[in-house]
From Swiss-Prot:
Function: Catalyzes the attachment of proline to tRNA(Pro) in a two-step reaction: proline is first activated by ATP to form Pro-AMP and then transferred to the acceptor end of tRNA(Pro). As ProRS can inadvertently accommodate and process non-cognate amino acids such as alanine and cysteine, to avoid such errors it has two additional distinct editing activities against alanine. One activity is designated as 'pretransfer' editing and involves the tRNA(Pro)-independent hydrolysis of activated Ala-AMP.
Top-level EC class: ligase
Entries under PROSITE patterns matching the protein: AA_TRNA_LIGASE_II
Name of this protein: Proline--tRNA ligase
HAMAP family in the cross-refs: Pro_tRNA_synth_type1
Catalytic reaction annotation: tRNA(Pro) + L-proline + ATP = L-prolyl-tRNA(Pro) + AMP + diphosphate
Source species of the chain: Enterobacter sp. (strain 638)
Molecular function GO terms recorded: aminoacyl-tRNA deacylase activity; ATP binding; proline-tRNA ligase activity
Amino acid sequence: MRTSQYLLSTLKETPADAEVISHQLMLRAGMIRKLASGLYTWLPTGLRVLKKVENIVREEMNNAGAIEVSMPVVQPADLWVESGRWEQYGPELLRFVDRGERSFVLGPTHEEVITDLIRNELNSYKQLPLNFFQIQTKFRDEVRPRFGVMRSREFLMKDSYSFHTSQESLQETYDKMYEAYSKIFSRMGLDFRAVQADTGSIGGSASHEFQVLAQSGEDDVIFSDTSDYAANIEFAEALAPSAPRAAASEEMKLVDTPNAKTIAELVEQFNLPIEKTVKTLLVKAVEGSAYPLVALLVRGDHELNEVKAEKLAQVASPLTFATEAEIRAVVNAGPGSLGPVNMPIPVVIDRTVAAMSDFSAGANIDGQHYFGINWDRDVATPEVADIRNVVAGDPSPDGQGTLMIKRGIEVGHIFQLGTKYSEALNASVQGEDGRNQILTMGCYGIGVTRVVAAAIEQNHDERGIVWPDNLAPFQVAILPMNMHKSYRVQELAEKLYSELRAQGIEVLMDDRKERPGVMFADMELIGIPHTVVIGDRNLDSDDIEYKYRRSGEKQMIKTGDILDYLVKAIKG
């Protein structure tokens, strides 16, 4: 490709509305342009990268035995009503009515469509297992699209769905998908972790997220410093302290704390160690409970894990925090003065709280706290559960090492769905015993457009993008200095350009009448891994300058050796 016949579209300045580095560089490198909020046009450079991601995903899905299909973006509302998600999904589901007054949605995902297809196409266990995938546009009406293509409304996704007659068969395919995903992200040159995850509203028995490690990530990735253990923040187990609870050394006393309505204020005003404080959060109880609310207690410096809390038998789902009015109706005190002593509703405490002694908590009286509280002396030990987020330095749940926390960008997610959709849509086949058998499902997604942004977040410097070799829009950039004035520069550039293309190497030759500084800046911004600079001065000694983008290393290579050097560097 020649720049004179190509839409380069690079920008010198960073657009003001671009928050994260991937969004900034995708705009500056001429990869995307914003059409409307959360909607982007992919320009030639961006599309070349996107297609490389697609191709790697498609190759590994084919290698894993998945079968490619293509399903409509527009889906009939009837299917969503039948599955129960018409009411459940929320405003992210874009709904519309056609001229015949029939209701439809723009697909954010395709569980309903694929399950409907399978229930009409398969009839026997002998046809299973099967795993179908597509790489296709999705639409989710995000309330606040942000970070460019990282969280857009329209995006490209690889979604696949497997069907089985047994849990053992599902597990086998799940393991294949786990391995395929690991190969996909490894081939892309990404630093990632496969982490155990909560199955959430999708349900099912197992789930893993694939997280690309990056400071701009929205997720906390938890992993051991010595083992393979990895999980997301919602799933990671916080073990109980190994040391026994210390004996009481203080008497409980009631203290006036009129200006301490938060843990931070209590700690500051009374010079307390935050590790000796407890915060109390009230949430709505499950329907039918004898009490309207449940009290959840975590240490002052810890955070409640809402996913874990929602799984408690006493707690309503979805987890809903009580309003101040609801709290006062039950406890007769405000949110800043709550604690376990004389709490008139069920109490669940975190494992760490159960190991505390001589701690401080609200007295359930406005403007007052108890100091020196001890379990079983001042208040009976209530139910104990793991309800907090882990923190760096906690022991790893697998017993090996301690936990570290880094930020991550979720680029893939695999689920064992079980029978949630097949039961709702009555997808069954005749089993080996002749009876109808509801199918067991797995689903596996990769955010294809998000992968592009995640790769940039992990691979950039002050000059621009530093693509992993397998994702770069071009493999080689040829920069002929003043080729329009020098016949020998032009002749050698054209020769090398043709030879590289004949080798199947993707090459961009900058044949613009531009200053060298502009040419260098654009190629570094775009992130092409290998650059060759052809100029009259170096040709006097039969040399060509070669530069590797990632290291910045430059070297002189003889004109007769440059082709072999590049072929070896690229193809190995």
